[in-house]
């Protein structure tokens, strides 16, 4: 279970492991990046519609913007955005079979576990590295628990920001 499903004090302990990345000071420090990302997406949107053809604002702006932000916080490479977006859509769109939705969830968990191993080997300034180095390496969490937290932030970060 992740901290969403826990009561205090376990909820507070697990939430505390990642909350510094979501505090105002950290978000304020990302503001220039967020504004630039929004501007880049808007510029790309304008370029797509320069000949008067319609452009899907949701697909080309509203969905990618929060994804880029949460992926930056987590440490997810942007090159993986299409795969992650597709898997998340399958698991949440309501028209997939239960088997397909479950497979998509497992695909995301497997992806996060692989990324977690990479961050253990080469940490960066991101949530996954922080969990790996500060929680799993010293034995406060096992890898599966840390992967679940990262998975929760990945899927909830996309869903709640949009």
Feature-to-residue mapping (PLM):
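Active-site substrate-recognition loop segments, prototypically the cytochrome P450 B′-helix/B-C loop
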Residues: 1-58, 67-85, 89-95, 99-103
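Alpha-solenoid HEAT/Armadillo repeat architecture
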Residues: 4, 23, 27, 117, ...
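Cytochrome P450 catalytic core segment centered on helix I
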Residues: 41, 84-139, 144
């Amino acid at each position: 279970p992740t901290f969403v499903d826990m009561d205090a004090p376990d909820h507070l302990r697990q939430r505390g492991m990642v909350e510094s990345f979501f505090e105002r000071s950290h978000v304020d420090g990302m503001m220039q990046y967020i504004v630039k990302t929004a501007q880049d997406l808007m510029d790309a949107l304008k370029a797509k519609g320069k000949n008067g053809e319609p452009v899907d604002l949701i697909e080309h702006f509203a969905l990618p913007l929060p994804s880029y932000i949460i992926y930056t916080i987590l440490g997810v490479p942007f090159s993986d955005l299409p795969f992650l977006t597709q898997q998340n859509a399958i698991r949440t769109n309501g028209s997939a079979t239960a088997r397909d939705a479950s497979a998509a969830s497992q695909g995301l968990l497997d992806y996060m576990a692989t990324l977690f191993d990479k961050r253990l080997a080469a940490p960066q300034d991101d949530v996954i590295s922080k969990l790996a180095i500060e929680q799993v390496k010293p034995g406060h969490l096992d890898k599966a628990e840390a992967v679940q937290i990262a998975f929760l932030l990945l899927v909830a970060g996309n869903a709640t920001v949009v």
